[in-house]
């Protein structure tokens, strides 16, 4: 069972508006109780999510602890799988895609790269996957025009929804102007 999210917890409501985190987790737990079921939380990799992917992994690992499912489950064919997984999913990329990682200013990228180190050991266990994301943050050029387009889109969305980017993601404050 794949559950498509953008963030772990109530932050998810910002991009997946409106969503109720309690309902998402409640439904995930129901599916986890079904036999031969594997739960995967999947997200896109975009300008807002890339700095928070460790929180998703950490949340999934918390469910593994809660369900004591670190060792995996052996199915009827003898294959071992873990009940709870996460996947970084698709990379937002391409001409005109406002939420591509290239729209992230360099100072925010530094903040996000530092976050990857804050989570420590469990990131080292999956080093290759995390290194790809880290390298992407570090090496992709900043696209200032795309950044401006993204911020304009965010501001219009916030005005329409009655939300505010910087209430959830304060690192964007220097770049955010309320309409």
Model-identified regions with their sequence ranges:
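Radical SAM enzyme core and accessory elements
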Residues: 113-179
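Radical SAM/AdoMet-radical enzyme domain recognition
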Residues: 1-90
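Flexible glycine/acidic-rich beta-alpha junction loops that bind and position SAM and/or redox cofactors
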Residues: 45-51, 67-130, 137
């Amino acid at each position: 069972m794949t559950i498509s999210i953008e963030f772990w917890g109530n932050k998810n409501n910002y991009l997946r508006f409106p969503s109720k985190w309690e309902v998402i987790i409640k439904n995930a737990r129901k599916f986890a109780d079904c036999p031969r079921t594997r739960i995967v939380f999947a997200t896109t990799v975009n300008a807002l999510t890339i700095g928070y992917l460790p929180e998703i992994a950490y949340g999934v690992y918390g469910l593994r602890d809660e369900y004591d499912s670190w060792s995996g489950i052996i199915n009827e064919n003898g294959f071992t799988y873990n009940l709870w997984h996460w996947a970084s999913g698709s990379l937002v990329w391409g001409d005109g895609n406002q939420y591509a990682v290239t729209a992230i200013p360099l100072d925010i990228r530094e903040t996000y790269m530092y976050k990857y180190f804050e989570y420590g050991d469990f990131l080292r266990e999956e080093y290759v996957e995390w290194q790809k994301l880290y390298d992407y943050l570090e090496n992709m050029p900043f696209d200032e025009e795309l950044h401006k387009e993204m911020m304009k889109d965010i501001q219009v969305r916030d005005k329409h929804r009655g939300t505010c980017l910087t209430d959830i993601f304060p690192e964007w404050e220097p770049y955010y102007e309320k309409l």
